[in-house]
């Protein structure tokens, strides 16, 4: 992954979530804005998915002209609620694959500024990635060079049963339990 990322609600790090930036400076994660959680729920509903829990994670990725994201699955959440993805800025090639492997078959789709993609149900765990960004394709009125992607998820996590807050030293890297 060469995109730069920050998180709201829960901090994602490979294979887990935490309330602090465990693989960075240890700072607390900023709260998920209620309006952004509501956007996730409205998008999922408009796509025909009933979501009972609140969207409580936003992964905000910035892609410059050379950034990429390899094929991966959004599988660290305990919830099966759909993933909601909002694109702003430069167009990207979004590769949407299958649920078994990172390789073919997959479909390449251009995501443009303002596009909103919802994937849930059987496709919730499909491998997907961004093999390239198309520089200079952002709407000029946006004033943005590069691409911002806001990915909204429902964690299915609770504070209870998670690791205790450390007294000293680096925070625990263990993911919280459902």
Q: What are these regions, as identified by a protein language model?
A:
Residues 1-178:
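Non-heme Fe(II) oxygenase metal-center motifs and adjacent flexible, charged/small-residue loops
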């Amino acid at each position: 992954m060469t995109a730069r990322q920050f998180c709201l609600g829960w901090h994602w790090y490979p294979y887990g979530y935490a309330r602090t930036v465990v693989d960075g400076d240890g700072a607390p994660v900023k709260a998920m804005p209620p309006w952004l959680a509501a956007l996730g729920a409205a998008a999922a509903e408009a796509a025909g998915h009933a979501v009972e829990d609140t969207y409580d994670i936003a992964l905000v990725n910035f892609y410059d002209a050379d950034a990429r994201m390899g094929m991966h699955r959004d599988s660290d959440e305990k919830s099966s609620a759909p993933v909601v993805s909002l694109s702003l800025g430069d167009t990207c090639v979004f590769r949407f694959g299958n649920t078994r492997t990172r390789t073919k078959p997959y479909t390449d789709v251009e995501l443009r500024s303002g596009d909103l993609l919802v994937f849930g149900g059987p496709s919730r765990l499909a491998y997907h990635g961004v093999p390239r960004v198309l520089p200079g394709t952002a709407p000029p009125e946006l004033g943005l060079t590069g691409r911002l992607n806001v990915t909204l998820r429902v964690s299915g996590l609770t504070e209870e049963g998670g690791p205790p807050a450390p007294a000293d030293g680096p925070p625990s890297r263990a993911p919280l339990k459902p």
